[in-house]
């Protein structure tokens, strides 16, 4: 599910190596370039020349969050792992978070993302690029006031989130899903957190 506030799909050009001319055109045409897929054979190194990013604009239009394919492993589509970049509406980069792994098989890609109604928090859930713990959907929270990313699990005593879906109520209260008892994946329960209060509590502990 993609937030309706995606402003546009931008295309990033990737410079081609000098060896490009020696690869058959069919290799590029047949390359898998999206869909969060693992590939049985490596795609050409200079394939997927146009990488698509998703841009999420805050309700007040002041801040943009870009979800970019990390493009680490040739045995996967470029979007198998993600980077998240936060920018002002003027184009200034405020901060970023890289969810890629050294070999492209132990990181995460963004599953769902959304700004809070008050524009103070950007929230996104993720899925493991290597298929590890398929029941787990880590959620990250970006605080515009603090200009930092924090794990939602740190706000709920270290418990995992077991669904990629979440929703907002009020200006910045987030409701996600965790387990009722540790290890019990058959009994899931909703949990709601006031993100502003939770961020302040975490800040005082640091």
Segments (PLM) and residue ranges:
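N-terminal secretory signal peptides that target proteins for export/translocation
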Residues: 1-10
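Acidic, small-residue rich beta-repeat scaffolds with periodic aromatic anchors
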Residues: 30-56, 142-206
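Beta-strand-rich domains and repeat architectures in extracellular enzymes and scaffolds
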Residues: 44-78
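Blade-terminus and WD-like Trp-Asp/Gly-His loop motifs, strongest in beta-propeller folds
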Residues: 55-69, 113-121, 164-175
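Beta-strand C-termini and the immediately following turn/loop, strongest in propeller blades
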Residues: 67-78, 124-129, 176-182
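Structural motif
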Residues: 77-84, 131-140, 183-193
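A short beta-strand motif characteristic of beta-propeller blades
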Residues: 94-104, 148-153
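Short glycine-/Asp-/Thr-/Trp-enriched loop segments that recur within the blades
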Residues: 102-108, 158-163
């Amino acid at each position: 599910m993609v937030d309706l506030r995606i402003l546009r799909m931008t295309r990033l050009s990737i410079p081609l190596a000098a060896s490009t001319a020696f690869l058959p055109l069919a290799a590029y045409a047949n390359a898998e370039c999206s869909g969060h897929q693992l590939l049985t054979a490596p795609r050409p190194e200079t394939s997927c020349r146009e990488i698509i990013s998703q841009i999420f604009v805050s309700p007040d239009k002041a801040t943009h969050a870009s979800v970019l394919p990390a493009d680490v492993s040739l045995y996967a589509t470029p979007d198998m792992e993600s980077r998240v970049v936060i920018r002002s509406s003027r184009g200034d980069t405020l901060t970023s978070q890289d969810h890629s792994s050294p070999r492209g098989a132990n990181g995460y890609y963004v599953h769902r993302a959304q700004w809070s109604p008050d524009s103070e928090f950007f929230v996104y859930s993720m899925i493991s690029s290597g298929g590890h713990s398929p029941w787990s959907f880590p959620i990250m929270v970006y605080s515009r006031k603090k200009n930092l990313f924090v794990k939602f699990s740190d706000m709920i005593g270290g418990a995992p989130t077991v669904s990629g879906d979440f929703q907002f109520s009020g200006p910045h209260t987030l409701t996600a899903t965790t387990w009722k008892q540790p290890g019990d994946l058959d009994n899931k329960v909703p949990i709601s957190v006031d993100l502003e209060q939770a961020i302040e509590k975490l800040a005082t502990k640091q």
